[in-house]
């Protein structure tokens, strides 16, 4: 019973495989005609080499072993009806082929874009790091210049203290000068007052003497006495001359 089932399965698998091969043979000339009409037919050796290179593995033996094992597994699965080719299988193959094409053609472009992006970001980070390092160095230099800030502050404090003392002395001298100037002005005003008072007194004395002399000159007795004295002096002079 089991042998008959295996025989029937083998017959069904051979029939399905023959139908697939026949349909592939029918479709192959049509595809070949369309391909030849649009582009020249590529070299089979080159195409086979590209397919082998697309397989995973490092050596040709490994890639050939993977290809043979995969083909044997597919044939075994189809012959034992473990896997039946249907519409979903065709869609899966088309999707896998499209994914392979995308991985083959778009992966290098994406790799170039990613490398350029990484390089740009790396350059930005490097420039930022260099600027940060320069800023830190400048800060260190500015701080190192202030390492003697205590001594400088002490000197500045001494200078400011001396400046305050000099300003205090200058203010004191200024006050003394202003006081002396004020005292001098007071003394000058007092001297001027005394001089004016003395002049007034002298004027009053002179006026008193002049008025007294004038009053005496108007006195007849004084005039007679002066006249007699003058006559006596003249007579004496004449006597001396003789």
Curated annotation (Swiss-Prot):
Domain of life: Eukaryota
UniProt keyword annotations, A-Z: CF(0), Hydrogen ion transport, Ion transport, Membrane, Mitochondrion, Mitochondrion inner membrane, Transit peptide, Transport
Record GO biological process: protein-containing complex assembly
Cell cycle keyword on record: no
Any one annotated GO CC term: proton-transporting ATP synthase complex
InterPro entries: ATP_synth_Bsub_B/MI25 (IPR008688), ATP_synth_F0_suB (IPR013837)
UniProt entry tagged with the keyword NAD: no
One Pfam family of this chain: Mt_ATP-synt_B
Gene3D superfamilies recorded: 1.20.5.2210
Transit peptide: 1-35
Compartment(s) where it occurs, according to its Swiss-Prot or TrEMBL record: Mitochondrion; Mitochondrion inner membrane
Family: Belongs to the eukaryotic ATPase B chain family.
Record-given protein name: ATP synthase subunit 4, mitochondrial
Organism the protein comes from: Candida glabrata (strain ATCC 2001 / BCRC 20586 / JCM 3761 / NBRC 0622 / NRRL Y-65 / CBS 138)
């Amino acid at each position: 019973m089991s042998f008959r089932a295996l025989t029937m399965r083998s017959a069904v698998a051979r029939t399905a495989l023959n139908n697939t091969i026949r349909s592939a043979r029918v479709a192959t000339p049509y595809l070949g005609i369309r391909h030849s009409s649009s582009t020249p037919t590529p070299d089979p050796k080159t195409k086979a080499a590209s397919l082998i290179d697309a397989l995973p593995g490092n050596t040709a033996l490994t890639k050939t072993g993977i290809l043979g094992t995969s083909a044997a597994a597919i044939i075994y699965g189809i012959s034992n009806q473990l896997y039946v080719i249907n519409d979903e299988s065709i869609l899966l193959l088309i999707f896998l082929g499209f994914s392979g094409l995308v991985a083959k053609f778009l992966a290098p472009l994406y790799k170039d874009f990613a490398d350029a992006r990484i390089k740009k970001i790396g350059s930005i980070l490097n420039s930022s790091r260099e600027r940060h390092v320069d800023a830190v160095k400048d800060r260190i230099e500015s701080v190192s210049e202030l390492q003697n800030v205590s001594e400088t502050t002490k000197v500045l404090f001494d200078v400011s203290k001396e400046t305050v003392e000099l300003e205090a002395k200058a203010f004191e001298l200024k006050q003394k000068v202003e006081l002396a100037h004020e005292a001098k002005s007071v003394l000058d005003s007092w001297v001027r007052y005394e001089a004016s008072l003395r002049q007034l007194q002298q004027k009053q004395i002179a006026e008193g003497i002049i008025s007294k002399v004038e009053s005496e000159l108007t006195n007849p007795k004084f005039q007679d006495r002066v006249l007699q004295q003058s006559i006596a002096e003249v007579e004496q002079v004449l006597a001396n001359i003789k």
